[in-house]
């Protein structure tokens, strides 16, 4: 990792933290999800970075992957538990962070469980340690609070222009995941729930990424859209909202996206729902492993 790469990672983390901490104050009952996410993304762009992925706002039993669509009218309900998940990148060097806001004080202990688990995981995180041991730490902290970790969600290795780079950081103990590597970047994200401790895919898809830009048999318009996506986002996730420059015809745009997913050119990420409709909390930081040191790039300013 060069000094220039490290500086870009640190700045991307600082910008994401700024957006997270400022916009989390605007998460209130009746607020439009679209307004919140557009504010997040605007702050990132105003600070000369780009969103690493579309801002996620997942409410109550929604664990992840809800991002508002074009003209989305969804609002934050009274008493909601709201996960705000966002990231920034500079030249493909990525940050990823999340916070949970509860509009009902009854869920504060649930929030504390995932937040304390994140703090414990970071304290124990170091090069050479078994990745499974981080899962053990997270699971122990969450269960001690009387909740369940979500076993099929977790953190991940991050590489340039690659948000999920193949290494999984579990929320429970697992064998055979290798060890934490120096000169690497990881997202750590404990999820806690009062439900069953697992997520399943919902029907809605609001986030996409490029899967295979070389699929044969695409129409000229579909190829134009693929080129537009690659030029602007590389292989990072994107929202239909970010394609309005390509087409202002929403129905045409959605139809093209749907067809490109079916043909295997794009990948869709379904919303993830807690299996027993339990309420979910999440906290997340990006950590940079540099020699024997750990740098939390997304810590509050």
UniProtKB/Swiss-Prot annotation:
EC number(s) stated in the UniProt entry for this protein: 3.4.11.18
- Tagged with keyword Protease: yes
GO CC terms on record? cytoplasm
- Which enzyme class, named as a word? hydrolase
Q: Which residues bind a divalent metal cation 2?
A: 96, 156, 189, 284
Recorded superkingdom: Archaea
Question: What Gene3D superfamilies does UniProt report for this protein, alphabetically?
Answer: Creatinase/methionine aminopeptidase superfamily (3.90.230.10), Winged helix-like DNA-binding domain superfamily/Winged helix DNA-binding domain (1.10.10.10)
Bilayer-crossing regions: none
The UniProt similarity line reads: Belongs to the peptidase M24A family. Methionine aminopeptidase archaeal type 2 subfamily.
Q: What is this protein called?
A: Methionine aminopeptidase
Q: Which organism was this protein described from?
A: Saccharolobus solfataricus (strain ATCC 35092 / DSM 1617 / JCM 11322 / P2) (Sulfolobus solfataricus)
Q: What is the lineage of its organism?
A: Archaea, Thermoproteota, Thermoprotei, Sulfolobales, Sulfolobaceae
User: What gene does this protein come from?
Assistant: map
């Amino acid at each position: 990792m060069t000094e220039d790469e490290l500086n870009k990672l640190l700045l991307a983390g600082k910008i994401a933290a700024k957006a997270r901490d400022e916009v989390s104050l605007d998460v209130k009952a009746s607020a439009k999800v679209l307004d919140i996410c557009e504010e997040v993304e605007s702050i990132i762009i105003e600070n000369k970075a780009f969103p690493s992925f579309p801002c996620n706002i997942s409410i109550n039993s929604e664990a992840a992957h809800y991002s508002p669509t074009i003209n989305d009218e969804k609002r934050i309900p009274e008493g909601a538990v709201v996960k705000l998940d966002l990231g920034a990148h500079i030249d493909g060097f990525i940050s990823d962070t999340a916070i949970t806001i509860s509009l009902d004080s009854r869920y504060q202990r649930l929030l504390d469980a995932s937040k304390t688990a994140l703090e414990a995981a970071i304290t124990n995180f170091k090069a050479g340690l078994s990745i499974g041991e981080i899962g053990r730490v997270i699971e122990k902290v969450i269960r001690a609070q009387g909740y369940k970790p979500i076993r099929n969600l977790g953190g991940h290795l991050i590489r340039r222009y690659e948000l999920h780079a193949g290494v999984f950081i579990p929320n429970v103990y697992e064998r055979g995941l290798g060890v934490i590597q120096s000169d690497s970047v990881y997202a750590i994200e404990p999820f806690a729930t009062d439900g069953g401790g697992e997520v399943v895919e919902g029907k809605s898809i609001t986030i996409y990424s490029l899967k295979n830009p070389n699929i044969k048999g695409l129409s000229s318009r579909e190829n134009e859209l693929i080129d537009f996506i690659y030029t602007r986002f590389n292989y990072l996730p994107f929202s239909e909202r970010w394609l309005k420059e390509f087409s202002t015809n929403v129905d045409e745009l959605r139809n093209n996206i749907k067809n490109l997913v079916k043909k295997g050119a794009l990948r869709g990420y379904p919303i993830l729902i807690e299996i027993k409709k339990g309420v979910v909390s999440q906290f997340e930081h990006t950590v940079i492993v540099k020699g024997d040191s750990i740098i939390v790039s997304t810590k509050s300013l």
